[in-house]
From Swiss-Prot:
Gene3D superfamilies hit by this protein: Lactate dehydrogenase/glycoside hydrolase, family 4, C-terminal, NAD(P)-binding Rossmann-like Domain
Biological processes per GO annotation: glycolytic process; lactate metabolic process
GO cellular component, one term: cytoplasm
Function comment: Catalyzes the conversion of lactate to pyruvate.
Binding site for NAD(+): V18, D39, Y69, G83, A84, S105, V122, A123, N124, S147
GO MF entry, a single one: L-lactate dehydrogenase activity
Protein name as catalogued: L-lactate dehydrogenase
Record-linked PANTHER family: L-2-HYDROXYCARBOXYLATE DEHYDROGENASE (NAD(P)(+)), L-LACTATE DEHYDROGENASE
Record: active site: H179 (proton acceptor)
Length: 323
């Protein structure tokens, strides 16, 4: 008699706009069989759990409930979206000190619960908070992953797809580096059906500046949304659910994530956005893309900026680390 598989269990920490959108996306797509939600606003979570469960008759069965940290013990995945939101005029890096303190109050009780699964960090600044989660938790590097440039890459695919009149899913393109102001597109690789976007632009008699215009548009998209409606959540909530699905379903999928550097791009001791393979055991492989000299300079500059802010924030906040 075949042994019944354990239901896939996800704990979400943070039930704000991003967290609740992630939860709704998980319900809509039928990802995981159990979803516990933790937030300091306990009544709000209870209401959200009931509301989300009301969608299950038209999606798939799922146990959804207001959770607490001991519930993390047997979870497969803990997703962290909790943190101070980015306000108009702020960069993601401006959030670092306050969100490091919030993160510390989350990671410690999750680890103390006996959790042996995978951390997926979504809160900003995601590269720094992912590295901090790894250091605070004492977990192996393959069990701490950040959403990285997944949203930025999706935005880039959307813009290129619109320009070339193709479905964004047919665009092979990546944004690399920090999920923030120093991110950059890998134009030496980015293509549609093998035709580099740079060559397509040239063949259609567009100025070379078109590539920089696209870069700027993608980089500024979050600021535009925040200025207009106060926050971004649909894109990142859906992207995060996609990452969760790839992990829980053991897809061995290549995604642009915030992952640890161990010599890739000449970088060490930080997490930054690059393609990586993920599956049921977490991070399986970090992919070092071949970059042009200019792109390598941009990657180094992005890493330098992250390290500068991270080192300063770690000293100022006095965050306790296990490694």
């Amino acid at each position: 008699m075949a042994r019944e598989e354990k239901p896939r269990k996800v704990i979400l920490v943070g039930d704000g706009a991003v967290g609740s959108t992630f939860a709704f996306s998980m319900v809509q797509q039928g990802i995981a069989e159990e979803l516990g939600i933790i937030d300091i606003a306990k009544e709000h979570v209870e209401g959200d759990a009931i509301d989300l469960a009301d969608a299950t008759p038209w999606t798939s069965p799922k146990n959804i409930y207001a959770a607490d940290y001991p519930d993390c013990k047997d979870a497969d995945l803990v997703v962290i979206t909790a943190g101070a939101p980015q306000k108009p005029g702020e960069t993601r890096l401006d959030l670092v000190n306050k969100n490091l303190k919030i993160l510390s109050s989350i990671v410690e009780p999750v680890v103390e619960s006996g959790f042996e699964g995978i951390f997926l960090v979504v809160a900003n600044p995601v590269d720094i908070l992912t590295h901090a989660t790894w250091r605070m938790s004492g977990f192996p590097k393959d069990r701490v992953i950040g959403s990285g440039t997944s949203l930025d890459t999706g935005r880039l695919q959307k813009v290129i797809g619109k320009m070339e009149n193709v479905d964004p899913s047919s665009v092979n393109a990546y944004m690399l580096g920090e999920h923030g102001d120093t991110e950059f597109p890998a134009w030496s690789y980015n293509n549609v059906a093998g035709v580099k976007v740079a060559d397509w632009v040239k063949a259609h008699n567009m100025p070379e500046s078109k590539l920089e215009d696209i870069h700027q548009e993608v980089k500024d998209m979050a600021y535009d949304i925040i200025n207009k409606k106060g926050a971004t959540f649909y894109g990142i909530g859906t992207a995060s659910a996609m990452i969760a699905k790839a992990i829980l379903n053991d897809e061995h999928r290549v995604l642009p994530l915030s992952v640890p550097m161990d010599g890739e791009y000449g970088l060490h001791d930080l997490h930054i956005g690059t393609p990586a393979v993920v599956g049921r055991k977490g991070l399986e492989q970090v992919i070092e893309m071949p970059l042009s000299d200019k792109e390598q300079e941009l990657m180094t500059a992005s890493a330098d900026q992250l390290k500068k802010v991270m080192d300063k924030a770690f000293k100022e906040t006095g965050v306790k680390v296990r490694q």
